């Protein structure tokens, strides 16, 4: 089992009021994203402790080398999740690349014989069995091409895209995360026994609605899909609606 070091490096954003009865909701961000993507969700999902994961290479872990392959990343995240949950019920949420990482984390926990989450939430991500069609590898793109792609996806402030110094900070983890995605190989395993909620959006260039519907084949548990109006980051742009859907799905697990 991989060593994780200081757990606070991985989980830097804690609920302001500790509640031992709160359901841990581990959140994994999109490519290049950090824990701050979920900061506004604090106290927004009643009965849960929203715990965004901070991956190396960004924000408070800027000087650390980011992971570049799925297996290594998932191995350590599975350890972080099982250590923090400590046998309590928990849920997982992942957006875009984070959805794939969350899914593979659940499968890694199963292989270890560890408890499964009570619910898996995925957004902005085609089902893992879908053939990837993301265009040219990001690692080979020139900076202007990467900026153009980020601008097309949305979610990155324009001032940041126009700042050469800021780009030097955000592009390395972004490229590394895309290496995780581009080298990922889906391996068939028995379906999970975990309920899945899929949060799709009407105009997502990286995850068409019909490809998100195929998450149905990844579990024998119930699957529910909600489709939000908007693009790749609709779940954050409509945060109140997203949090209400999470609250509804977790109602039986929270007080």
Regions found by a protein language model. Name each.
Residues 1-93, 100-255:
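Domain-scale detector for complete catalytic domains at protein termini or as standalone homologs
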